[in-house]
Amino acid sequence: PGEKARVIEAIRDAEQRTSGEIRIFIESRCRFVDPLDRAAELFWSLQMDRTQDHNAVLIYVAMKDHQVAIYADRGIHEKVGQLFWRKEVIAMTTHFREHHYAEALLEVISDVGEALYIHFPFDRNTDKNELPDDIIFGK
């Protein structure tokens, strides 16, 4: 399968173990100085704050600007803390420098999925897929 299909499959695999949600937004350029500000804007505009447990995570990538950010809702952020997200961004940036884009996304999806699983395990009686698993492409 292609890289896009592999990334979407990784999101689905991660979400099968947790009530948490993972989304990816990719665009060419970041119009903000800090990519985290852009990720936050997208998080809210995509209504990712509406998950039941406030455990959605947005992985943001601006390809041409070589910028990445991860924005997480308060439910998961309070569990794992700022250092976790910083380490994930550093790992993604390292892969991106070597043009290993799919590997970067697959690794962060796996790590975030594991954190979501630990703190928000899947419950077949109450959990449903609250957000689409597709990759969102901006301009």
Cite the ranges covered by each PLM segment.
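Divalent-cation
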Residues: 1-17, 22-124, 128-130, 134-138
